[in-house]
Swiss-Prot record:
It comes from Burkholderia orbicola (strain MC0-3). One of its GO terms (biological process) is response to oxidative stress. This is Peptide methionine sulfoxide reductase MsrB. Keywords: Metal-binding, Oxidoreductase, Zinc. GO terms for molecular function: peptide-methionine (R)-S-oxide reductase activity; zinc ion binding. The keyword Metal-binding applies. The active site is at residue 128. Its cofactor is Zn(2+). Belongs to the MsrB Met sulfoxide reductase family. The gene is msrB. GO terms for cellular component: cytoplasm. It is an enzyme of class 1 (oxidoreductase).
């Protein structure tokens, strides 16, 4: 699923040649063509350090470690984004399913999908995000 046919315009306009140079092949395919990394292979699946997860394309802060939980699905999971402005959600009809795609609201990078099977004592949502779409910035818990 490529974002080429998408009508939404995002504030950060990406240069494809620059992205191909800067990103790994997996990061490029995930963020620009909505590929999915294999379950349990992502760099941040089991990361428990305190910090912020940012968009690998534009460095927009997306999720904080306090919202991360172990869902057992094989991808980093969060019960909420950093705030309501950083995520764009779009219905995804690919692969014979109906899901909600999650994209960076600043650059349009594909991040993953959101499902309604997250922790009931929090938001009830599970943002299932590809590690390849993220960069992690470690920081002390009290910041």
């Amino acid at each position: 699923m490529s974002h080429d046919s998408d009508d939404k315009t995002f504030p950060y306009q990406k240069d494809d040649a620059e992205l191909r140079r800067r990103l790994t092949p997996m990061q490029y395919e995930v963020t620009q063509h909505a590929a999915t990394e294999r379950a349990f292979t992502g760099e941040y699946t089991d990361t428990e350090d305190a910090g912020i997860y940012k968009c690998v394309v534009c460095s927009t802060p997306l999720f904080e470690s306090g919202a991360k939980f172990h869902s057992g699905c094989g991808w980093p999971s969060y019960f909420k984004p950093l705030n309501g402005e950083v995520i764009d959600e779009k219905v995804d009809y690919s692969h014979g399913m109906v899901r909600v795609e999650v994209r960076c609201n600043h650059c349009g990078a594909h991040l993953g999908h959101v499902f309604e099977d997250g922790p009931r004592d929090k938001t009830g949502l599970r943002y299932c995000i590809n590690s390849a779409a993220l960069n992690f910035e470690s920081r002390p818990e009290n910041e």
